Amino acid sequence: GLFRKLRTEPVILLTEESSMTRDLFYGFDLLTHRVIKINGRYCVTAGFFKNAYRFGQLKDTLVYSETCEFLGVDDSIDLSMANALLAGGASAVVGYVNNVYTVYSRSMLWDTVNYLILGQSIGQAVAHAQATYGTDDLVWYTAQGGKRPHAAAAYTMLLGDADAALPIIEEPADKAPVQQAA
């Protein structure tokens, strides 16, 4: 119709600056809008991950995005990026709905990664971070004494396998011969 409805779509902004040579390299992805250009830089869309990792190359990967609106906003949840990563083989994807306070998202990421390193599953690690910093960023913000919160609370969503964990890497046994007592 005359008044099209427009909505945002999650993208990942790359630090790579666009150029004519790089445009040729990304040619087909640019034509199909799997890669787009914003302010002279490339961005990848969910379609990029669906295409580039369609054979499961992200197997056993845990993805944690601490960016704003990675999973959309309250009235327009958008799981396209998470679903593309899961379709590419990622075991689990964690991201935020709504705009998130940077210090809250960084604290949540730090806590989650530390508890993954301690052997917890992604579900357990995210739950620990939420118990420590709050289930959303407004809980954290008001606990810090904040007086002017933003409009909508940002909260994490976990998609995929909540029991996924970091692989346990076994140290190889020391092959050096043990010296026997004489």
Task: Describe the role of every protein-language-model region.
Residues K5-S107:
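Catalytic cores of nucleophile-dependent amide-cleaving enzymes
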Residues T61-A181:
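Active-site-proximal C-terminal subdomain of hydrolase catalytic domains
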